[in-house]
Amino acid sequence: MSRPEAVICHPVRTAIGTYNGALKTTPAVELGAVAIRECLRRSGLAPEALDSVVMGNVIQAGNKMNPARQAAIHGGVPVDKPALTVNRVCGSGAQAVASAAMEIWLGLAHAVVAGGCENMDLAPYLMPGARWGYRMGDGQIYDAM
């Protein structure tokens, strides 16, 4: 049984920032959107021609739900196209590409944008008891990174 060939074409990456540097206020989903827009521009592929978007993102706290979907929509992908967020520490972007290839091999998709989006500068501090208010005694703050 043969499977469709999965080909990586027109790869794009954003700049690599330094901690507390120029990208410290840029949300991960916007970095992902920039990469998606540029990949589509370079390839000449219309966003409507995509079947799926797969993006890796590890520190999802503060990014709201499904960062891949947010990046896809901000990147110009129509809202009727599905998006999957992959979370595999230190390998989410690579896993996103592998998962996109699997979608193609299984015949679920023909054109998929895959990659990763992360900004560790925006990893929030978490206060588990803050939603309902702290009372007497010490509270605790956790670093999401």
Q: Where are the predicted features?
A:
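Residue-level detector of conserved, well-ordered beta-strand and adjacent loop positions
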Residues: 9-10, 56, 87
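Short glycine-rich phosphate-binding loop at a beta-alpha junction
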Residues: 49-56, 113
